[in-house]
């Protein structure tokens, strides 16, 4: 595999990483040759540096790197998360074919379907008003309390599918900063609010601290006996859930083979299901399942997740681009970049290979972004003219949900297309100077000003086009990126499914709490930490 990477680097050097502008000028069919589709979902990667030779090498890289073999190991239930001895089967949660999926010889689909059915019944009862609060009033607000994968997925998807909301209002609390839950509690009434506490172990400090605040909110207003009527849980720690005061009939479980950042398809998606209904949640699963089938069956040259992963690897480990920008031209996808940030960086932000040796080259990039067109008036300046090349990934629906605002959607489309074209084409000195002289500027001044209006161009982007942001389309988009991250992880030769860096932070915070509370000395910590503790303590008084 290393030999192929070196070949890719040599090819990139020989072609100067492909002059994308020249490639379009020389090939009128470049778009059709370097774009692939899955039904209405189109992925255009013609505005990247990929050419025929590079694509052949990337395909060979996937073959020799074991992408297809590792893919089947994942789907078959092998414990590919070897540092925790766990299978990786979030795909089973959206296995709409209901074909058996085995973990340690046991078919998990009956359990998956049982939890999904229980979620559906509970969601319907909340939405219809059958399930009421302690005083007999229907639930009007649902507050999900979780963090990380128990928050980012539900927040992102619930916002993305706002046009499909016909259930109670949805709110989300994640940060241990008391301001977060305090602000949410100002928006809801105890008698008509349901809290969902999402924590597999029911020990996550942030989640349980916020859950206790919510419990006090209910108990103070309605009495201790009311707690059971206003809480549900997504957890496997039944004893701890019971001790908290939540009825076992309102507890929904999931499994060790579901990683937090892949858990939106599980009971963690309960607040989304309550917001949009079980039928739409089912369509969300359908979209992801369609991508799973495509990922398993399509040849590499037509396989969206594999191609996306190969291009991502090429950008990171061949061309050395350190970041990627996620730029959805859809305001309702405003949390999608943050969702992908966790998915990608928590999965592939590793420095050790599966053999326990240091990663050669780079592992995952920094992932960031904002929705268009907002980003155009913020950081696109750097993408266009900065010294770092930042691959951009655009997303745009052909149709919006507001037919009366069609003109605004057309403006949105024109902006995203203009940005991808501008990144590729740029503007030469001669073009910039002519633009200035055409406006009446004298030649000498134009020579001075023109360099500031030059855009180098040749900056890569991928554009995704789809019909409309439906539950099916969203499920498809998320699964596409999940599998992309998997492919890149295989090529980086890392375990994409553990997160020991997250665990380290938890350990250190737990150890520092007694120091912050003034119960223990800070002497065992470094001088910076000691100084910060002292400064904060002084201000707190």
From Swiss-Prot:
Residues forming the catalytic site: 346 (proton donor), 377, 506
Keyword vocabulary terms for this entry: Cytoplasm, Gluconeogenesis, Glycolysis, Isomerase
MF terms (GO), sorted A to Z: carbohydrate derivative binding; glucose-6-phosphate isomerase activity; monosaccharide binding
Location within or outside the cell: Cytoplasm
Reactions listed under catalytic activity: alpha-D-glucose 6-phosphate = beta-D-fructose 6-phosphate
SUPFAM superfamilies on file: SIS domain
Gene Ontology cellular component terms for the protein in this record: cytosol
InterPro entries given in the database record: G6P_Isomerase (IPR001672), G6P_Isomerase_C (IPR023096), Phosphoglucose_isomerase_CS (IPR018189), SIS_dom_sf (IPR046348), SIS_PGI_1 (IPR035476), SIS_PGI_2 (IPR035482)
PROSITE patterns referenced in this protein's UniProt entry, alphabetically: P_GLUCOSE_ISOMERASE_1 (PS00765), P_GLUCOSE_ISOMERASE_2 (PS00174), P_GLUCOSE_ISOMERASE_3 (PS51463)
GO BP terms: gluconeogenesis; glucose 6-phosphate metabolic process; glycolytic process
EC numbers for this chain: 5.3.1.9
Domain of life of the organism encoding this protein: Bacteria
Enzyme class: isomerase
Principal location class: cytoplasm
Record pathway: Carbohydrate biosynthesis; gluconeogenesis; Carbohydrate degradation; glycolysis; D-glyceraldehyde 3-phosphate and glycerone phosphate from D-glucose: step 2/4
Function: Catalyzes the reversible isomerization of glucose-6-phosphate to fructose-6-phosphate.
Family recorded in the similarity comment: Belongs to the GPI family.
Protein's name according to its UniProt entry: Glucose-6-phosphate isomerase
């Amino acid at each position: 595999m290393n030999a192929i990477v070196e070949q890719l680097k040599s090819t990139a050097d020989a072609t100067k990483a492909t002059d994308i502008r020249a490639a379009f000028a020389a090939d009128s069919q470049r778009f059709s040759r370097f774009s692939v589709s899955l039904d209405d979902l189109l992925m255009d990667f013609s505005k990247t540096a990929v050419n025929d030779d590079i694509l052949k090498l990337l395909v060979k890289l996937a073959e020799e790197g074991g992408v297809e073999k590792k893919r089947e190991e994942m789907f078959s239930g092998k414990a590919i998360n070897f540092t925790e001895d766990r299978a990786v089967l979030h795909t089973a949660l959206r296995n709409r074919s209901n074909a058996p999926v085995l973990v340690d010889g046991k078919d998990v689909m009956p359990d998956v379907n049982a939890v999904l059915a229980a979620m559906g019944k509970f969601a319907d009862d909340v939405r219809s008003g059958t399930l009421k609060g302690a005083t007999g009033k229907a639930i009007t607000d649902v507050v999900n309390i979780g963090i990380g994968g128990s928050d980012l997925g539900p927040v992102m998807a619930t916002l993305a599918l706002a046009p499909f909301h016909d259930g109670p209002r949805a709110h989300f609390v994640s940060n241990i900063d008391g301001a977060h839950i305090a602000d949410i509690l100002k928006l809801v009434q105890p008698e008509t609010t349901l809290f969902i506490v999402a924590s597999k172990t029911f020990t996550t400090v942030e989640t349980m601290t916020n859950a206790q605040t919510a419990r006090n909110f209910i108990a103070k207003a309605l009495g201790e006996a009311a707690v059971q009527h206003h809480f549900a849980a997504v957890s496997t720690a039944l004893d701890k859930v019971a001790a908290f005061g939540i009825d076992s009939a309102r507890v929904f479980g999931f499994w060790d083979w579901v990683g937090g950042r892949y858990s939106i398809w599980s009971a963690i998606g309960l607040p989304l299901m309550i917001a949009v209904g079980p039928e739409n949640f089912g369509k969300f699963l359908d979209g992801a399942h369609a991508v799973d089938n495509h990922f398993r069956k399509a040849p590499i040259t037509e396989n969206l997740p594999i191609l996306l992963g190969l291009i991502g690897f090429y950008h990171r480990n061949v061309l050395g681009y350190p970041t990627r920008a996620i730029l959805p031209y859809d305001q309702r996808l405003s949390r999608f970049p943050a969702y992908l940030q966790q998915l990608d960086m928590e999965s592939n932000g590793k420095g050790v290979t599966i053999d326990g040796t240091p990663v050669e080259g780079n592992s995952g990039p920094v992932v960031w972004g904002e929705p268009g067109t907002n980003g155009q008036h913020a950081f696109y300046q750097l993408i266009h003219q900065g010294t770092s090349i930042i691959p951009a990934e655009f997303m745009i629906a052909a149709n919006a949900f507001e037919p009366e605002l069609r003109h605004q959607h057309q403006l949105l489309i024109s902006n995203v297309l203009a940005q991808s074209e501008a990144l590729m084409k740029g503007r030469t000195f001669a073009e910039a100077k002519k633009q200035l002289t055409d406006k009446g500027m004298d030649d000498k001044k134009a020579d001075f000003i023109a360099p500031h209006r030059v855009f180098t161009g040749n900056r890569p982007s991928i554009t995704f086009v789809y019909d409309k942001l439906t539950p099916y389309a969203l499920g498809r988009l998320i699964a596409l990126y999940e599998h992309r991250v998997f492919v890149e992880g295989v090529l980086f030769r890392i375990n994409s499914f553990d997160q020991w860096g997250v665990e380290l932070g938890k350990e250190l915070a737990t150890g520092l709490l007694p120091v912050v509370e003034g119960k223990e000395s800070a002497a065992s910590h470094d001088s910076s930490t000691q100084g910060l503790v002292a400064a904060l303590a002084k201000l707190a008084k």
